[in-house]
């Protein structure tokens, strides 16, 4: 048992990725925690009162540790009105948006969620999109909460460690969903996991976790060999029986292969890897002209919601990583974790 597993009282070196948007609800997260891995709730896009309901439900379903992931607000200024108008004309239903959420309201939401994590004594809290503010870090660490940061480069990982993270998740370019990158890059920033793990493991003193394209025990073993103390997995859990992902999303993952995904900003304004669909193909020429996150995300929300109601995969954000070719079978969390971490795996 390594340091990461000891910190969180785990029997398996696995974190179920906290996938926002209604995918990782208590049924999935508790099933993961009950099998000795770390289940995760995603607070992104959730109102604090709904997060509280999910926390209460988690405590009813499991006595094992779990984590809550929190988006760190980016605090970006509102884009120019002419750019907003242009995108409203190009996104179905975007004209329904009359105003964007004020930055201060996003920070209020962030701190309400931190207070909730403290109040309910949640075992671990992870952060995505930026360095968490120092006051939140201090409060959580004083309360004994294990802190997990997300990084896509060694430099970002070092900053996360310096900020006080107990564990750092290294997100390779293979990973599905939103990139956790938060620093500008001079060159190619989409670093693959095989290059990222050993460099970060050598540079950091805290445990590092590998994320991106891992779907079976071979990927787990490889990550551990390269210096990671655990792995974080999203796509494979997304298609489990217990997942609340849209049935069409699950189906498209089962049908896709590694060449069917790409990084795009079109849905949210922030790079995210998903299965290519008609919306991405039609708007590809505008990839470099999107509004910054979360403004683009707000404008596409109604379109994505309508697409989900209509089972229309062509306008859904079908987040998935590059390891999906062999994800052809829907299984239970228990079955998946046995596949990921058979009894003979050495940790």
How would you label these PLM feature ranges?
Residues 1-203:
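Active-site entrance/lid segments in N-terminal catalytic domains of soluble metabolic enzymes
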Residues 179-183, 187-209, 214-347:
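Conserved active-site-proximal phosphate/metal-binding subdomains
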């Amino acid at each position: 048992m390594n340091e990461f597993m000891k910190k969180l009282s785990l029997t398996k070196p696995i974190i179920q990725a906290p996938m926002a948007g209604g995918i990782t609800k208590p049924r999935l997260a508790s099933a993961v925690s009950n099998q000795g891995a770390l289940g995760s709730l995603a607070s992104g896009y959730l109102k604090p009162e709904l997060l509280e309901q999910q926390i209460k439900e988690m405590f009813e379903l499991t006595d094992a540790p779990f984590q809550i992931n929190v988006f760190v607000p980016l605090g970006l200024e509102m884009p120019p009105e002419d750019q907003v108008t242009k995108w409203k004309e190009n996104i179905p239903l975007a004209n329904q948006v009359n105003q964007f959420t004020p930055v201060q309201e996003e920070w209020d939401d962030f701190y309400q969620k931190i207070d909730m994590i403290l109040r309910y004594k949640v075992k671990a809290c992870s952060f995505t999109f930026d360095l968490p503010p120092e006051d939140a870090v201090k409060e959580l660490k004083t309360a004994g909460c294990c802190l997990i940061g997300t990084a896509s480069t060694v430099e970002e990982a070092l900053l996360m460690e310096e900020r006080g993270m107990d564990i750092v998740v290294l997100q390779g370019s293979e990973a599905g969903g939103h990139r956790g990158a938060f620093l500008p890059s001079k060159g190619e920033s989409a670093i693959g996991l095989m290059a990222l793990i050993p460099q970060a493991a050598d540079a950091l003193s805290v445990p590092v976790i590998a994320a991106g394209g891992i779907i079976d025990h071979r990927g787990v073993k490889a990550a551990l060999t390269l210096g990671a103390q655990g792995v974080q997995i999203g796509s494979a859990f997304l298609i489990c029986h217990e997942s609340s992902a849209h049935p069409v999303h699950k189906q498209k993952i089962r049908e896709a292969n590694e060449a069917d995904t790409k990084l795009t900003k079109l849905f949210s304004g922030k790079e995210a890897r998903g299965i290519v669909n008609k919306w991405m193909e039609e708007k590809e020429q505008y990839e470099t002209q999107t509004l910054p996150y979360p403004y683009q995300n707000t404008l596409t929300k109604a379109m994505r919601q309508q697409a989900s109601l209509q089972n229309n995969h062509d306008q859904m954000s079908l987040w998935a990583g590059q390891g999906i070719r062999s994800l052809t079978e829907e299984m239970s969390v228990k079955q998946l974790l046995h596949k990921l971490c058979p009894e003979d795996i050495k940790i």
